[in-house]
Amino acid sequence: DIQLTLTQKIQLSGAVIVTTPQDIALSDVRKGADMFRKVNTPVLGVVENMSGLTLKGTVYDSEKNPLKSGFVEVEEKYNSQIDENGTFTLIIDLFKKGGGERESQRLGVPLLGKIPLSQTIMDSTDAGNPISFSSPDNPYSEIFSDIVLQIAKDLGH
């Protein structure tokens, strides 16, 4: 309904479909994307929001020295090698995986980006200072910048 009202009130250059990875969200997103196509509004791409939670940490031995090697495993599903500094990175897919990719393939448009769950993104947004402005060199800012650059390129800007 909102998509239809938008297309009736203003001329859109294109639409970006934003979804989360789980199936229930995708069913609603499909309806909206299909409606944009019916009213001849180009779908420029898909963005997957809440696309995994990245956990980074350091593993220490009983004497508080970083482990030089090893393995971290969570729920037998997520695992990561411990590097020589004792650090590891795990990406946990809380809301499934690949929904944005599947929808972009269905529509024949690019997956513009995957925005992870992040305390950093949430805190900066809640403070009214989006991370792209407050910390432009942050890796999360780069995700947003890449999305914007792809959209601008598609629109000829």
Per-region residue spans from a language model:
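Short boundary/hinge segments that flank catalytic cores
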Residues: L111-G113, F133, E142
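Short, amphipathic alpha-helical "lid/cap" segments that border enzyme active or binding sites
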Residues: D137-V148
